[in-house]
Amino acid sequence: MNRLSTFDNRKNLILSTLFIAIFAQIQTAWIADDAAITLRTIDNLLHGYGPVFNIGERVQAYTHPLWFMLLSGASLLIGNIIVTAYLVPLLLSLTNLWLFLKFIPKNSITGVLGVVPLLLSASYLDYSTSGLENPLSHFLILLSAVAAYSIHEKNEYKPTTIFLLGSLLYLTRPDLIIAIIPIAAIVVHQNNYSRSELATSLTIGSIPAVAWTLFSIYYYGFPFPNTAYAKLGNGIPIMERMGQGLIYIIDSAIRDPVTLGSILTALTISLRAKLMERGLALGILLYLLFIVSIGGDFMSGRFLTAPLLFSAIIITKSNPDTDRYKSILLLLLILGGMSLKNTITKSSEFSIKDILTTGIADERRFYASKTGLAHVGRDFFRLSKTTHTTRAVEVTCGGLGFSGLRGGPNLHLIDYCGLADPLLARLPAKYDERWRIGHFSRQLPENYEASILEKKNLLSDPEAIKIYDSLTIITKLPLNTPGRLKEIIKMNLVANNNKLDRYRFDAIPQDSETPAILYEQQGAPEVQSSADTHNSSNFSKSMDIVLRKSLILQSMGFLSMTNNVYLISMYFNGVLIPLKEIRSTEKTENGYFIYQFKPDQPLKVPTDRIRITAPDGSGQYILKNFEVKEKDSWQ
């Protein structure tokens, strides 16, 4: 009778948990821009262009091969990549909750302790959808835990199972291998496997990871994602990164107390727990140390969902007495209540003020009104149907994924953060004392945009020319081109020389010519969010503003996304006359910096052309809302 009652209680817990989760996840389902980078690659694959972000350029712009393959297969069956990006994470996240409650707790009572933080954590709920790989990571973590406990307690599986799951986890989120090493080591050490048995198990288990790595080297030319090379080249000192990493942890504690609170609770419990729980706790600590060492992430809480899941397992396995049970449950409920405002009750309204000086953002809140399932219309599900009819090239960083989906396959996006660009990923990041984690901009070599558009090497820098030629052979020429393997070996084994350091510290001219725009006084666009670059003007070094009529310039103003120094000059009788350097003194709510120009002395000669020059800065500039007046009235 007791066994039947226990079964009924567990069944009721599972059903009630899934019911709550379905409501919460449908309400909060969204798609992140980083996920849209993967979706564009899938879209290109399904349309016959190959698994590439920009057609004709073999670059792995996604970090999660197994997630990419899962979404690609599902998109092929479903027929719509956007529907797939909502549906697959939702189904997988519900499966994870069922798997957790079915196999982890000893009974329904301890199951409640584990499921409370998973339901109330803003981070866990946000990234149970999002289109990112978190749900698949959670699935493989749970399978690894189930397998490890089965081997540890019942010796039901061979170590091959753990190694195979680790291999699949590597293909989903490579750094999570760190977190499961301790429990894998416990399983191996406890059972005294022979060397030959371990070697056989390791060989079989590593087949998926090795097979993918060999394919990646052959197809893309490199063993790791392009994103890894872009982020490894950031040049940020380790102590600065660790400082930012600690801020990332603190940010989570403020925004989402139940996540960090549950992790700390689990680590405390593990001090008196059994061997496997101590192994899980060690995995949490190692992974947290890794997170801190890389500077965390710009998406608040994203990297803490795996440690939270490990913590839920530890809490569930703790089997506390009645008093401790009540104390732990009360603590989790209080912390969960504090986090509740950031879960299903969270507003979808977002201001750029929410991105603190730390550069960490509530990413779902930013995208909720744009990609949230509760907010999107039918047109959103037809994103990839909108295409450029002719080939075009644009330079961008933020909003890379959705810009690519909206632009279609004929739009080549140069990602100056390097995530999707093979050359820029291998150049040093531009030095910026106000760096933001995950957004390390590069300076484009001179004439790089023209080289992409014309499909030939027009660069002027000898060092960049060499790298670009090698990358052209690796990423653009046919796979079996003679000499391609040699270039792959050279690019992977030979380090770049110090002559490229000037891309980090110097101001590099990006174009041989200065672009010009015609100034239209009427209908100046209103400022939108900092991620919206529509109705704006981009330039890399300087830009000319052509006036419809000559006037005596008394004042001028514009908005810029970056707080740089700009030199204002004007043409008079064909001669460029420098006037004044200006710096921003104010920032709008939407994150733009306001620039106002007034000459030190009243000008007495007219001009019909004004030049804005950035003597130094990021190498990529976006200006909006030009206003030129003959009276000193710009606001």
PLM regions: where:
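Loop-to-helix entry region of an early transmembrane alpha helix in multi-pass inner-membrane enzymes
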Residues: 55-61, 65, 69, 76-98, ...
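Hydrophobic, aromatic-rich transmembrane alpha-helices
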Residues: 2, 97-101, 181-189, 251-288, ...
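C-terminal luminal/periplasmic domains and tails of membrane-associated envelope-modifying transferases
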Residues: 364-635
